Curated annotation (Swiss-Prot):
One of its GO terms (cellular component) is cytosolic large ribosomal subunit. The gene is rplL. This is Large ribosomal subunit protein bL12. CDD domains: Ribosomal_L7_L12 (cd00387). The lineage of its organism: Bacteria, Pseudomonadati, Pseudomonadota, Gammaproteobacteria, Alteromonadales. It comes from Shewanella piezotolerans (strain WP3 / JCM 13877). Gene3D superfamilies: 3.30.1390.10, Single helix bin (1.20.5.710). Pfam families: Ribosomal_L12, Ribosomal_L12_N. Forms part of the ribosomal stalk which helps the ribosome interact with GTP-bound translation factors. Is thus essential for accurate translation.
Length: 121
């Protein structure tokens, strides 16, 4: 005879908190898993609670004014003319990666002022 999910839930509802903790520990030992890992990856709310700290600035298009975009890229990255032109022409491309939110917003503003289309990821 097998136990149904409802029977398991009913048995859990009747347990004290300490008994549930002991049950979880026993299940972790038996199956070689950790309940903490399941909790972290379990819900969409868990990911929303953690704020992203590193951002990538992606140039999606150089826009109508390619020259202004190249100048803005050179100023932001320190690249030479040839490298900045290559970056502008190979969009979509990451301009800077793993930077702070403030840096990403400032870079996006500068590039958009030059006419480029930019995303922050």
């Amino acid at each position: 005879m097998s136990i149904t999910k409802d029977q398991i839930l009913e048995a859990l509802a009747e347990m004290s908190v300490m008994e549930v903790v002991e049950l979880i520990e026993a299940m972790e030992e038996k199956f070689g898993v950790s309940a903490a890992a399941a909790v972290v990856s379990g819900g969409a709310d868990a990911g929303a609670a953690e704020e992203q700290t590193e951002f990538d600035v992606i140039l999606t298009s150089h826009g109508d004014n390619k020259v202004a975009t190249i100048k803005a890229l050179r100023a932001a990255t320190g690249l030479g003319l040839k490298e900045a032109k290559g970056m502008a022409e190979s969009a979509p491309v990451a301009v800077k990666e793993a930077i702070t939110k403030e840096e990403a917003e400032a870079l996006k503003t500068d590039l958009e002022a030059a006419g480029a289309a930019v995303e922050i990821k």
